[in-house]
Design a protein with these regions (language model features):
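An N-terminal assembly and electron-transfer interface module characteristic of large anaerobic redox
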Residues: 1-303
Length: 303
């Protein structure tokens, strides 16, 4: 789109539709396009008659927030446009909402959650917003007996699905043994199933061992164990709780994005307006365990 001329966009939509025959074409406004006010939604409305693919416009490309707000808007856009009505709900099926691939190693977390829910509750995943899923799975989101929200950005989407399909949601992230036990209890209550007793016993045994870890933190020296956690809001909260249960003091809970999209952020979670601010904190640490992404770790002192 140049100087308001959308001819190239119109031609691109027709060419994509004929060449690839996609089920859906997403039209995303860039920051410049959003700022100058190009009517992307209007273009999609009148071009819908010219193509077979369903056109979905995303016009939130401005500068009003960071990527966490963009994620929340994207999840809402998808659940408002893709899930089909009339899909029968099935027992033992769930959707995951808020699994952003921007989050550090989220694919590993999703794999672990799917394995855990299968073993403990006999549940199967339908769709995962937005990590390794398909249009067909998103269309069938109404099948789910429960929606599992792994990130604050997915809450609005889960609430919309609850209104549209009557599907309850559980907002919990299973970090640490205590967090995992709580997660299983909440999901089990939502689907009317009791978690497998052997899985619970295994987790409870490990939880007790972790609780005793704090007794050994003073052995050998008198230095208190310290840590810093940096990442997305829910990851920081979950991992910090796990460390504190083991007797490790978390000095800084550093959120990698702004807290604008968080309704009631915890008072001890820090968001930094400038990159230099959190870099100064990281570079000044000594004798401290740092849990963060590769970029942050490379900035830390070797000690």
């Amino acid at each position: 789109v140049v100087m308001g001329d959308v001819t190239r966009l119109e031609d691109a939509l027709v060419e994509l539709d004929k060449s690839y025959a996609p089920k859906i074409i997403f039209v995303v406004a860039s920051s410049v396009t959003a700022v100058i006010g190009t009517d992307i939604k209007g273009v999609c409305r009148y071009m819908q008659n010219e193509v077979k693919a369903k056109l979905i416009a995303f016009d939130q490309g401005g500068f009003r927030g960071d990527y966490s707000i963009g994620l929340a808007e994207t999840y809402k856009l998808l659940v408002r446009n893709l899930p089909q009505k009339g899909v029968a709900q099935e027992s033992g099926i769930y959707n995951i909402i808020g699994a952003s691939v921007w989050r550090y190693r989220m694919e590993s977390d999703v794999w672990e959650i799917k394995s855990l829910l299968s073993e403990a509750l006999g549940l199967s995943c339908n769709a995962c917003l937005c990590c390794d899923t398909s249009v067909e799975e998103l269309e069938d989101m109404g099948r789910a007996q429960v929606n599992i929200v792994l990130g604050n950005e997915g809450l609005a989407a889960a609430k919309y699905l609850q209104e549209k399909f009557g599907t309850p949601y559980v907002y919990a992230v299973p970090y640490g043994y205590n967090g995992t036990l709580s997660f299983l209890a909440q999901v089990g209550e939502a689907v009317g199933r009791e978690p497998d007793s052997m899985v619970l016993l295994r987790l409870q045994t490990k939880e007790k061992s972790l609780s005793r870890l704090s007794l050994f933190t003073m052995m050998g020296n008198n230095k208190p164990k310290k840590a810093v956690v940096k990442g997305d809001y829910d990851l920081v909260q979950g991992v910090s709780a796990f460390l504190e249960q083991g007797g490790i003091t978390v000095l800084h809970k550093m959120c990698a994005h702004s807290l604008k999209a968080i309704a009631e952020p915890a008072a001890d979670v820090e968001a930094y307006a400038e990159e230099s601010d959190w870099l100064q904190v990281i570079r000044g640490l000594q004798d401290t365990l740092i849990l963060a992404d590769d970029v942050a770790l490379l900035q830390a002192d070797a000690d």
